[in-house]
């Protein structure tokens, strides 16, 4: 039996989109219109302007045919006395007429939760307004997985955050992802920019198999019909006859990740890998609960599939 990851095999175009960025509406350097134009010039089809606690539906560059995904970023800081930790959440939702509970320019106060059990009430309120949520930059937030592994309702978490990687060399969020996946938490992974400076933008994105409208994009995201990338393209990912198979643009490394050994890795110093097959066993001979792949091109840029669950 062939199990194909949801991003592949459909007839829709693979749209390029940004899910986390900031403008002068909060603490970003770029005017909203300039940020939208920059993304359009870099081949983006859709973009969420997720300024801190300040909801947005508006395309501030109306001459640009960019689908604007409604959204904002919600934040919560705790343990302030001797340093602090954070919960940050990107919220993205439908058009106002499709039931989104937020108003244009609606402002929110920062959260005051002291732990994930208290923070859940904020997520519940966001979900009640028909918004999807992404757990942001756990490494930068100094939140080990045990601080957020019980949060309910996040459809995704950030694997890559360009601002954190550029400014702090913090790009190891995928390790947290595998910890959650290994615990049975079914959550997808996204690459974002969290762009504050203009030089942060257009470095991490998602490729979503959807029609180019808000409802279709959100449905595809919620159902895992996408992959995350900083450059490489992924064309197919599936499991069949005891093998995990991936097709991609030319890369130098491909790694299979799961909750168990053995791990699998293929390398080509020339950077010409476009097809890999890893034997993972079939039926009772397969000990993995899930498999996912990371590809790395000759410039060090990564892309990540979402998991295929096998249990």
Regions found by a protein language model. Give the residues of each.
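Short, well-ordered alpha-helical segments in soluble proteins
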Residues: 158-164, 181-184, 225
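Short, hydrophobic/aliphatic alpha-helical segments
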Residues: 173-186
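Alpha-helix boundary recognition
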Residues: 40, 127, 181-182, 222
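A metal-dependent hydrolase metal-coordination microenvironment
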Residues: 2-132, 136, 143-145, 150-153, ...
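C-terminal functional module detector
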Residues: 1-14, 183-188, 193-311
């Amino acid at each position: 039996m062939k199990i194909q990851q949801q991003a592949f095999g459909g007839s829709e175009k693979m749209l390029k989109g940004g899910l986390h960025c900031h403008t002068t509406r909060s603490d970003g350097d770029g005017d909203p219109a300039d940020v939208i134009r920059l993304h359009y010039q870099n081949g983006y089809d859709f973009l969420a302007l997720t300024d801190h606690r300040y909801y947005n539906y508006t395309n501030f560059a109306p001459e640009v045919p960019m689908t604007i995904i409604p959204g904002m970023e919600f934040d919560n800081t705790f343990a302030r006395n001797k340093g602090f930790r954070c919960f940050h959440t990107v919220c993205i939702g439908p058009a106002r007429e499709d039931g989104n509970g937020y108003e244009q320019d609606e402002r929110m106060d920062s959260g005051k939760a002291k732990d994930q059990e208290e923070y859940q009430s904020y997520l519940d309120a966001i979900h009640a307004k028909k918004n999807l949520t992404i757990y942001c930059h756990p490494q930068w937030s100094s939140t080990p997985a045990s601080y957020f592994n019980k949060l309910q309702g996040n459809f995704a978490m950030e694997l890559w955050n360009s601002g954190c990687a550029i400014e702090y060399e913090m790009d190891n969020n995928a390790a947290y992802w595998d910890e959650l996946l290994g615990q049975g938490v079914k959550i997808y992974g996204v690459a974002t920019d969290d762009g504050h400076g203009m030089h942060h933008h257009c470095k991490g994105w998602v490729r979503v198999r959807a029609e180019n409208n808000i409802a279709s994009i959100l449905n595809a995201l919620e159902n895992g019909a996408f992959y995350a990338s900083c450059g490489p393209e992924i064309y197919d990912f599936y499991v069949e006859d005891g093998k995990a198979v991936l097709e991609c643009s030319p890369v130098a490394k491909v790694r299979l990740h799961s909750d168990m050994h053995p791990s699998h890795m293929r390398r080509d110093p020339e950077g010409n890998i476009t097809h890999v097959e890893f034997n993972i066993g079939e039926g009772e001979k397969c000990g993995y609960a899930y498999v996912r792949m990371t590809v790395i091109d000759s410039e060090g840029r990564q892309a990540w599939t979402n998991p295929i669950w096998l249990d």
